[in-house]
């Protein structure tokens, strides 16, 4: 039997249109990222129907992101094992000539889109190394906090053990230009190893022996200004762009038979001097200019910047536009010795983590297993790792109301950050573990706590869903609940449903757990709760109902406008929005009637509810009336699933098709358990 990992991976690939529709595949901390040839054949709804998928986000006209959470790397590796996908191991499709094919983002602002995509895809592959290094920094800062060793002391004043520990994180940042050069070249379609070799040449002992940063030396008879390229990001980015054009020109000039030898030879021969003389200093100037501009804004009003940054992040992250800011943070550390973006960014992160913590507490109270899992994963990934994507895609982007709970937390946290003028002296991901990296760390702690608890309390007091979404969730939980305990039994005996087996009921019982009353061989026939055409559930254009995940049954294409009780029953749940009602019949059968699809978004308009929860109803009593024409005018399907939500208590359950069904037509037969 295939594992869940394999099944989900196959499900994603199949609904993306298969390997033939994919031109590129990569992943970041939480998302699988695809470029596809034809976005129209991607079945986003079907991909999202898998419980392991947190969300599906289109990008431009050819990009697709599938949000998987912290286990994304496992799914990425599993998809690579599938037929037709092995050649995507380097991210993009490769022909026999090794020339990479890239579809890219295409749209009205394709140039701007691609610029941001280029920066984002350059830094994403380096994320793991940056995360690891940031936690090593945190350990050293903690040692400083507890008075064990000064983090900022010169290396010649530190014990050998701490010098070695510093080398563990400095390896990532010192050689960052090499990593950036490789990933930037790969993104552009140039040779990634040549892209890495160009900045590497400027970090060699031989180059460093030429002199100190700021010195001018003569090379090839020309003056060369020396710079410290360790930790720089803009020089390798610009060098990679130059390499792309040089390689492209060389491949037009050099015969294919000898390109493998002479293209890399001339690329290195041209690009290393070009970078050392021109592109490198220019890149440092660009980085310093951006850093100085932001520093001027920060010096003018740290308070304003501290508020603007956390309020912007919730809108940048879904678009992937936050990644380029990492380059600016690193540049600030290289230029100024500190960074003023990471502190305020922590306000956004902890407002986000506070929000999902509130969602988790509500899910615990409601016994909502699905939301409990999603919110717990987002909470742990955030508080311990500083990763916000699981929270963003698992909760925030699925429930529109959440932004009204999130932004006040961002604002309050940003105000506190501005008051304390928070600075970071190392590049870290803002989590509980990296608090000591901020200065003053106590002020930063107050800021993230303010952001966290503001958003969490807003969720607890006002919920994270609209009234209709909350009712929808409760209806689905009631429908999916398949336990022996059920809501209170009626206060007085009620006659059994027509066609049901006789049932005994204790008069005067008020809070008795009702058990199914169908023995083996007994049968209950359920009539249609509304007039219309009875069709198989498989015809419902919703993967959850069509697959029977909420229970077996039948679907009705309404010709009338009233839902009635098919038998004597107790209303166990009814939506305020009127689009769904759940009943427990005297036989113990629990029935969910869901009027139309996506009708929750109407917020009750077009529906009139005639009953309330725990009310006793007789066969034929009206439950809900609705306006079919109004619903159709909103382009919403009216097909109404009628499903048995506690099917595991019974034997075979059969839906019966009918060209015209009404209150006298049997549409579902439920057999007693063997």
Curated annotation (Swiss-Prot):
Pinpoint the PTS EIIA type-1 domain residues.
Answer: 542-646
Q: Which residues form the PTS EIIB type-1 domain?
A: 1-89
The UniProt entry annotates the active site at 28, 594
Does Transport appear among the keywords?
yes
Q: EC number(s)? A: 2.7.1.199
Task: Provide the PTS EIIC type-1 domain boundaries.
Answer: 117-476
UniProt GO BP = phosphoenolpyruvate-dependent sugar phosphotransferase system
InterPro entries cross-referenced by the UniProt entry: Dup_hybrid_motif, Glu_permease_IIB, PTrfase_EIIB_Cys, PTS_EIIA_1_perm, PTS_EIIC, PTS_EIIC_1, PTS_IIB_1, PTS_Sugar-Specific_Components
What is the annotated localization of this protein? Cell membrane
- State the CDD domains in the record: PTS_IIB_glc
According to the UniProt record, what class of enzyme is this? Answer: transferase
Cysteines joined through disulfide linkages = none
Q: One GO cellular component term, please give it.
A: plasma membrane
Q: Which UniProt keywords apply?
A: Cell membrane, Kinase, Membrane, Phosphotransferase system, Plasmid, Sugar transport, Transferase, Transmembrane, Transmembrane helix, Transport
Q: How does it sit in the membrane?
A: Multi-pass membrane protein
Q: List the Pfam families hit by this protein, alphabetically.
A: PTS_EIIA_1, PTS_EIIB, PTS_EIIC
Q: Which reaction does it catalyse?
A: N(pros)-phospho-L-histidyl-[protein] + D-glucose(out) = D-glucose 6-phosphate(in) + L-histidyl-[protein]
UniProt-recorded Gene Ontology molecular function terms: kinase activity; protein-N(PI)-phosphohistidine-sugar phosphotransferase activity
Q: Where are the transmembrane segments?
A: 126-146, 162-182, 193-213, 225-245, 260-280, 303-323, 344-364, 376-396, 409-429, 442-462
> What's its job?
The phosphoenolpyruvate-dependent sugar phosphotransferase system (sugar PTS), a major carbohydrate active transport system, catalyzes the phosphorylation of incoming sugar substrates concomitantly with their translocation across the cell membrane. This system is involved in glucose transport.
Domain description? The EIIB domain is phosphorylated by phospho-EIIA on a cysteinyl or histidyl residue, depending on the transported sugar. Then, it transfers the phosphoryl group to the sugar substrate concomitantly with the sugar uptake processed by the EIIC domain.
Name this polypeptide is given:
PTS system glucose-specific EIIBCA component
The protein's organism comes out as: Corynebacterium glutamicum (Brevibacterium saccharolyticum)
